[in-house]
Amino acid sequence: LEKEINAYQSLGCLNDMDLSLCFNIKKIASFKYPLEKGCVTKEYDITSHKGIDLGCNKEEENVYASGDGIVSEIIEKSSCGGNIVFIYHNVNGNRYTTIYGHLLDIKVSLGQVVDANTVIGLLGGESTAFINGGYDKCTNGAHLHYTISNDYHTYDFSVYTKDPRWF
C-alpha cells in the first residue's frame, strides 16, 4: 500500500484527493474489449476465476486499453499472471479498474494516460508458461486474462471484481 501511495504522490496527488480528480480521468460511456479479435476461452467465475480469458489469438497480438484512463500499476513477471497492467477508468461517473494479465510485453508506463487506441502490451501466455520453461504458473497457452473491478484497486481487488461481459 505504501508503494501505491508513493506512486500517487509522485504523480501530484495530494492526501485525501479523489483519484479521478487527481488524474483528471475523462468519463467514458462504456468499455471496449481489449483485443481486435478473439474468443472467450474461459468464463468469469466469482469463486475461482475472477475475470475472463480472451484467446483464439497468437502471442504478440496487440492488447489495447478498454477506454480512457491512467495506468495505475504494473507488475512484471509475476509467477501467476506474468506481466500485468492495471488501469483506472471513470465510466459514467463510476470508478473501475481494468486488469490485463499474461502479457508478453508491456508497452505503457506507470502514470501514463491511455485511451482505447493505446497499445498497452502484447498478448502472451504461451512462451511465458511455466510448462514451456517460462515463469508464469497460471497459464498454459496464449491468452489475455481480463478483469474488471469496482472502484480503484491495485491489490486485493479480487473481492470487487465484476464479470467483464456485463459491460
Predicted regions and their residues:
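A generic structural motif
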Residues: 55, 88-90, 149
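Zn2+-dependent peptidoglycan hydrolase active-site motif and core
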Residues: 65-107, 126-143
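Surface-exposed, glycine-biased beta-strand/turn segments
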Residues: 5-83, 115-116, 164
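Acidic, glycine-rich catalytic/binding loops that coordinate metals and/or anionic ligands
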Residues: 9, 19-27, 109-115, 136-167
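Cationic-aromatic interfacial patches
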Residues: 1
